[in-house]
Structures are given as structure tokens and as C-alpha cells.
Amino acid sequence: MPIFVNTVYCKNILALSMTKKFKTIIDAIGGNIIVNSTILKKLSPYFRTHLRQKYTKNKDPVTRVCLDLDIHSLTSIVIYSYTGKVYIDSHNVVNLLRASILTSVEFIIYTCINFILRDFRKEYCVECYMMGIEYGLSNLLCHTKNFIAKHFLELEDDIIDNFDYLSMKLILESDELNVPDEDYVVDFVIKWYIKRRNKLGNLLLLIKNVIRSNYLSPRGINNVKWILDCTKIFHCDKQPRKSYKYPFIEYPMNMDQIIDIFHMCTSTHVGEVVYLIGGWMNNEIHNNAIAVNYISNNWIPIPPMNSPRLYATGIPANNKLYVVGGLPNPTSVERWFHGDAAWVNMPSLLKPRCNPAVASINNVIYVMGGHSETDTTTEYLLPNHDQWQFGPSTYYPHYKSCALVFGRRLFLVGRNAEFYCESSNTWTLIDDPIYPRDNPELIIVDNKLLLIGGFYRGSYIDTIEVYNHHTYSWNIWDGK
């Protein structure tokens, strides 16, 4: 056990030992100890006050007092008062610090703090942080605050159980707070409020003071509106937290510049939010993702995927964002949504696929094509299942087709076209597009199914086609 010596105090010990000795029995938490009260009263004002002997005509040679200190910490302080030496290790340092603060023994206070800062451990960071606030120990407070912010996800349960409004605010307003996105902070504050049953006023103050609303998803914004009981939330122009700040994005940067960075990415959308996933950056495949709200014209952070991806496909389903296939791991699948700590790996596809067509009906995810130019297999994943299953084969291979659900049917269109009906579990042929296409897109405009874009034999197809559900055929769209 490390020993720390107060050399100045040691010089005065000999003089103290020559004074008249008065024995005192101290009853502490967990035991008692007999001390030389004369020496101990010289140590600090606390002991002078608490060991003061009441005046009587016949003084007893031994007095007895009760102190609200644990016996182990008190013993260490008594040994220090006799020898000028204090024994500190990771097991006793926190309790000894608290006892030395209560007893005003400055050498032990600063020695304990220095020991904690040099050999900092996660298991006592929350308690040290609380002491830093309670007793105004600025260096301990600063160090523990930064540590908790950095390890926030690991310490979440301890924080909820122990922190009041002030303790929480100091952590959550930090730029160093290590969270995957700002929605996570909103979800955490709600959990803290429910668990701790704090006053609603504290919750409102916390939301207004710490949430960076300009980086919230629509889901996060709706949660804040619900808390604040309003239709419009406060404006915030703070910089993003360091944990979800993109190193390749300069601030401020407009949406067009951000979109240009995500070259050859996968894209999908939920409402007004477009998700840009993976692609090619700095001459390599990357695992970055970002969301862009084209209504509010701001970007929303997304944590990096578990795997880099090029030629993958994204699809919203089951209130999550799924990313399927692509290089370099064409059978891999993962999912995430705002407020989640990280992407979660899902069951692997039965076949490797790049740029597959993916759609979801009733929370069942269907994957078609993307394997080879002759492959007609399909596979699907049921909610809460851990394995993909083969579905009914398509009539045509769909190596570079696209898929979209329209009118309770799953349309699969590229060079050829067909649709899937879930109730009958069958594919039905429809007329091929007027202009066959590779990698086109299907969109819905005014309750019409439109086929746009794509390439054929190296040329871009700029003609838009509209589906006629009466004739099962395609017509050139005139914009009406």
C-alpha cells in the first residue's frame, strides 16, 4: 500500500508527543478506537470541536464520543496524526477522501485527490464527481466530468440512479459528451426523469439547456415537442458534439456540399429525411452515414456502420433503418435508427448480393436480385427472426432492378417488370418498361407510380414512365 508523508507535519509530531495525553474512545461506524485526543485536536478544527471535553469537577481519564465516520478511514487519519504518514490505495481512497473532507485534514484531502487523478478508475468516478460538486473540488470535478462524458454510454445506469438536475446538466451540456446522436440525449433525459421522478420544471430546464435541437431527427424533435407541450421547439445554433462530428465536414457547410462528399452512396428516405449510406470516399470504401432533412435544411448525425459498404441497399422497416449487402461483405446486413447507440449486425443473407432490390411489406423485408445476371431467387426476413428464407422466384433475373411497394403490391422493375402479392405469395408479370433500365428508381407522386432514371447500354435514360394499373403497362409521363 503506498505511503505518503507530510514532512512538515512530521517535524511537529515530537513536540506534540511531549504534551499531556488525554485518552478518548471514539465510536465510529463499524467499530471504535482509543486515541490521544490532545494530538488529534491539534490536527484540525473538526477534532477540536468534537473531542472537546465537558467541564466536570472530577475529570475522567477516558472520555467517549461518537463520530459519523467509518472506522477504517478514521483509523488512517489517527495514524496520520501520530506519524505524519497516510496509507492510500484504490480500495480506501474514496472513503478516506470523504472522511478527510469532513474532518478538514487538508494534507490527506489533496493527497487523495492527486492519487485519484493519477490512478483514475471507472468504479469510483460517479462518487468522486458528486463530491467534486458537493465540496467545490474544482480539479476533481473537472477531471471526473470529462471522464463521465467520455464514458457516458458505459455509465448510463449509474448516472440515472445518482444524478440530480445540476449534476446532469454539467455532463449533458458538454461538447465532450460521447453519444451516437442527439436523439440519444433526449431519450436518456426522458429515462432519467421517469426513473428519478424529478420535478417537471427540472426536465423542461434540462431539455432547453442541453439539447442541440439542430441535430435532432424528426423523431427526436417530436419527443421534445411532447415534453415541452408545444408545436414549435427552440432554436439552437450550437456546434455538433465531438462524438458525432464528421471530420470531413467543414462548419458551416451547405447540404449540396455534404451530398457531394457521399459519392456512390446508398440512399433511402423516411418522410423528409434522406439517408446517405456508405459509398466511395478518399479512394476507398467507407462506413460513414449521414441523414439530411431537406425541409429544415440541416444534417443529422448517424454513427458509423459496422462494415464499410459500396453498392448496398438501404430500406426503412420495423421502425429501423436496414442496410443490405454490398461490397466488401455482400451477405452482411445491419440495422440502426435514431437514438440507438450503434448499428446492430443482423442475420446474413443466403446469397451474396450487390445493389439488390429491397422492399418491406408488413414489416417483412424482401430482397431480390443483385446476385448475378441469371439469378431469380428472392429471400425474406420475418420480424424478430434470426434467419433469412428463400421466397418464390421471380420470372426474370433482376440484377440491377429497383423495388417499391405500391397499392399493397411489391413492384420489381428494371429491364423487365413484375409485381409480388403477399396474400397469394406469387409474382405476376406486367409489361416491361418502354425504356429498359439498369439501376432506375421507383417513386410515388400524387398516387401514381413513376419510373425514373437509370442507364441502358451506357446512356442515361431521362424519360419518366408512369404505371397504368388498369392495363398493367407503362406510359410516358406528361407531368399530369
UniProtKB/Swiss-Prot annotation:
Domain BTB per the UniProt entry, residue ranges: 10-90
Domain BACK: 125-223
Matching InterPro entries: BACK, BTB/POZ_dom, Kelch-typ_b-propeller, Kelch_1, SKP1/BTB/POZ_sf
Keywords carried by this UniProt record: Kelch repeat, Repeat
UniProt keyword Repeat present: yes
Induction per the UniProt record: Expressed in the early phase of the viral replicative cycle.
Pfam families found in the cross-reference section: BACK, BTB, Kelch_1
Protein name per the record: Immune evasion protein OPG047
Organism phylogeny: Viruses, Varidnaviria, Bamfordvirae, Nucleocytoviricota, Pokkesviricetes
Gene that encodes it: OPG047
